[in-house]
Amino acid sequence: AREGYLVSKSTGCKYECFWLGKNEGCDKECKAPNQGGGYGYCHAFACWCENLPESTPTYPIPGKSCGKK
């Protein structure tokens, strides 16, 4: 299993969050069927996810820089 920042496949951006530490929104995103993670929390204003399957991409996605040129 791996861990990392959840990333939007369409934009390459991290999932933002503002409530640091235990975060219901991040935990929900992390455990969503398309992510398949075990536990999510808010770290440095982005959702960090643990126990992800190898197939789930994490930030950064090569070639996608989240709106930066």
Swiss-Prot record:
Chief subcellular location equals secreted
Q: Which PROSITE patterns match?
A: LCN_CSAB (PS51863)
Disulfide pairs?
C13-C66, C17-C42, C26-C47, C30-C49
For this chain, one GO molecular function annotation is: sodium channel inhibitor activity
Task: Output the superkingdom of the source species.
Answer: Eukaryota
Q: Does the keyword Secreted apply?
A: yes
Annotated function: Beta toxins bind voltage-independently at site-4 of sodium channels (Nav) and shift the voltage of activation toward more negative potentials thereby affecting sodium channel activation and promoting spontaneous and repetitive firing.
What name is this protein filed under?
Neurotoxin Cex7
* Organism of origin: Centruroides exilicauda
Upper taxonomic lineage: Eukaryota, Metazoa, Ecdysozoa, Arthropoda, Chelicerata
